[in-house]
A protein has these predicted regions:
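Metallocofactor- and cofactor-centric catalytic cores in central/energy metabolism, strongly enriched
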Residues: 1-409, 416-496
Length: 496
């Protein structure tokens, strides 16, 4: 096994593939590098002498500037590397993409559930969605009392509780409404019970204005203040929905019907070498096959945004991307926060130093696909290909945002590990094999095999097939097996 890797020929750093001791050496591009310090796996090593203020390159792009003189063979991290990110920027459109059908996977297909609106889901579940947090406990009780009706083609009955829906104003409330509307229309739901209280800001009559047209057979409403026994009536409505969903059958569908969300969390120094490029290959293959992928966590585009902007289909999409980036920077600044204050303690422990470094690894999940659309929070994905979605870096908030925009599953890469799940199957892809082995009950796929010189193309083919099997219901995500069905909504406003 190699001791270190230079990701791009222009990089001024290498990444340690195993723990290395001071005084040990390794070869990179014909030169012998002698370590000046102990360096843990996933962390960076200087490949040349670097002067104060000089840009440090990884992935072929700057990840920050040197704080001090750094000698060849030295450990590089927060003590000698700083972010170079600015605030609001003026961007220029420099198109750098090409339509490439060479990746097309002919006849790629899966078995899914086609809904009345034409969309295709990969699960057939009954969802109970409160309009307001006041009825969360009632929703949970209805879920528990309805489990007797889970059978046959029904994959599960779940309530999705949240604390919002009242004491919200303006755009903050509209964000909640759009998010909940996205879930209610989701193709993974064979039926939905919308549970209201009656006096909330987001009461059912007001919410229906945002919800728009809906399938009256599959979406039912119940106001708890309007009935004597809300539990009995709620369970009866769920029973009716289950009777309908039992008749649903999987059918053969083209991979072009898939909408897949992309997310990373607990990233480490290997995420941008293994797991994220593997997901990028998946994204290229699915979009070439006519499918759709959604990329969010906008703060983790900072420092790599120009790469995405250069892949925008046209000037209109470019302008939307600029607005997406600068609006999120303004959101940080409005609260007096630095835009580069992102890498978490876990990220840093795993070898990531700056937000630029994190972002350059993060955007690899989108492969080389053309950016076809930019979506506001809660807006459904309707354009095939790669779309950028407004959302934060927070794992649960971002994953739920992907689901609300129509993602039927989320591919979640991680170097540290996390057990959570959102309303759709949340597949965890480990960046390193030790994590996959230690947390086999969390991790669905081991991308760390690439560090052991596994063929990238072979693993990419295997992973594409793996995702299609998950979509067909032949494999359940570990998050599903652990019964992790969590919900979190992005909030930006006052609470009355």
């Amino acid at each position: 096994m190699k001791q270190a890797i230079q990701i791009h020929p222009n990089d001024t750093v290498a990444v340690a593939l195993t723990d290395l001791n001071r005084g040990s050496s390794f070869m990179i591009d014909g030169q012998n590098i002698i370590l000046c310090d102990d360096v843990k796996a996933g962390h960076k090593i200087a490949l040349k002498d670097i002067n104060p203020g000089e840009r440090i390159l990884k992935y072929g792009y700057p990840i920050g500037t040197a704080k001090v003189h750094i000698s060849k063979g030295s450990f590089i991290h927060s003590h000698n590397l700083r972010s170079s990110l600015g605030e609001l920027l003026d961007y220029r459109y420099h198109p750098d993409f090409q339509d490439d059908c060479s990746l097309k996977a002919p006849n790629a297909s899966f078995y899914g559930y086609r809904r009345s609106d034409g969309r295709v889901g990969i699960r057939n579940e009954i969802w109970i969605i409160p309009t307001v947090g006041c009825v969360n406990a009632i929703a949970k009780e209805i879920e528990q009392q309805s489990q007797q009706y889970k059978k046959g083609e029904i994959d599960g009955i779940y309530s999705y509780n949240h604390p919002y829906g009242c004491s919200q104003l303006g755009e903050d409330q509209r964000m909640t409404q759009k998010f909940l509307s996205g879930l209610i229309h989701h193709p993974n739901a064979g039926g939905v019970l919308v549970l209201g209280l009656g006096c909330e800001n987001n009461n059912i009559p007001e919410f229906k204005k945002v919800l728009g047209a809906y399938d009256e057979n599959r979406i039912r409403f119940l106001n708890c203040q309007d009935c004597k026994d809300e539990l009995a009536e709620g369970v009866a409505l769920v029973k009716e929905l289950c009777e309908l969903a039992l008749k649903d059958k999987r059918e053969l569908c083209s991979a072009r019907e898939l909408i897949v969300g992309l997310k990373c969390g607990g990233s480490d120094g290997f995420s941008g070498i293994t797991a994220n490029p593997l997901i990028g290959a998946f994204s290229d293959r699915l979009t070439a096959d006519g499918g759709s992928v959604l990329l969010t966590e906008v703060p983790e585009m900072f420092g790599a945004e120009q790469l995405l902007m250069n892949r925008c289909r046209n000037k209109t999409i470019f302008n939307k991307t600029v607005k997406l980036i600068n609006d999120f920077k303004s959101y940080f600044m409005r609260y007096g926060e630095r835009i580069d204050e992102n890498p978490s303690p876990g990220n840093k422990a795993g070898g990531i130093t700056t937000l630029e470094e994190k972002s350059l690894g993060c955007v690899q999940k989108a492969g080389t696909a053309i950016v076809e659309d930019v979506l506001s929070y809660g807006k459904p994905a309707t354009v095939k290909g790669l779309s950028l979605l407004q959302g934060p870096g927070n794992d649960l908030v971002a994953s739920c945002a992907l689901a609300a925009s129509g993602a039927v599953m989320v591919l979640f890469t991680t170097g540290r590990g996390t057990p959570f799940g959102c309303p759709v199957p949340t597949l965890k892809i480990a960046s390193n094999t030790p994590l996959a082995q230690k947390k086999s009950h969390w991790i669905d796929y081991d991308a760390g095999q690439l560090l052991n010189e596994q063929s990238f193309d072979i693993l990419a083919d295997d992973f594409y097939d793996f995702v299609l099997r998950v979509a067909s219901g032949k494999i359940n995500a570990k998050s599903e097996r652990l019964d992790k069905h969590d919900l979190s909504i992005f909030k930006d406003g006052v609470t009355l």
